[in-house]
Amino acid sequence: MKKLTEKITQFIENFKNVHAEARKIGFAGIMNLLWKDLFVGRSLFQWLYLIVLSSVPLILEFTQNTESHDWMSLFASWTGIVCVILVAEGRASNYLFGAINSAIYLVLAMNATFYGEVLTTVYFFVMQPIGLYAWLSNRINDQGKAEESHFEAKKLSVLDWLKYLALTAIIWIGMGLAYQSIHSVRPFRDSVTDATNGVGQLLMTRLYREQWIFWIATNLFSIYLWWGENIHIQGMYWVYTLNSLVGWYQWTKAVRKEA
């Protein structure tokens, strides 16, 4: 109970700090921070990486021999790719693109009757402001290190690994049983991404490097899930997989730098 009280007190204090900082710099200051987070401090290679990968949805759309364009899927794919690249770079602006992507992807998943993806996307949408708060709180409350890095990556201990793997199994089985109760055709298949996405988002919010392992698992399974359904979403998850490998590498370097 004492630890819970301390965490609640810390949450309230951090929220006050974030709110006070936002009021101090004003709307113009917030926009300036957003601009810097999006565009400042990126190397030439990172710019090329961002431009090339975010062009994949456009290439897929305009090289297909179709009479009409699937603009919703294209925009969902584009915002998703930009989001995960910003995550790999440790930029808080990823949550803006994540919120937009989640809203569009929710509609696509509902249309495809992928109920597991629907629930996961609702969870993602809710987690975006929470994640943004966590990242901003981390920066504001430790401003001495803010100039050195966009974020302070951490790594899981053996005990943490066991805890999060157990949580993954619980979510997978629990959601599988829930889908089974509503007569889903493939209940435990649908619940796979609920588990990997849910734990991955938790690790991302807490700035753990191992989030990328869960993202890789999610991406590979999602490619299988969307195979033959939507070329844009397939392409998005292939890019996600590549970016997850890059993200693992970048966050591993950040962990070693903080050690």
Where do the protein language model's features map onto the residues?
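Hydrophobic/aromatic-rich structural module bridging two neighboring secondary-structure elements via a short loop
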Residues: 92-134
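Short, Lys/Arg-rich, polar N-terminal cytosolic tail immediately upstream
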Residues: 1-40
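Polytopic alpha-helical membrane-helix bundles and their juxtamembrane interface segments
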Residues: 24-88, 125-128, 135-259
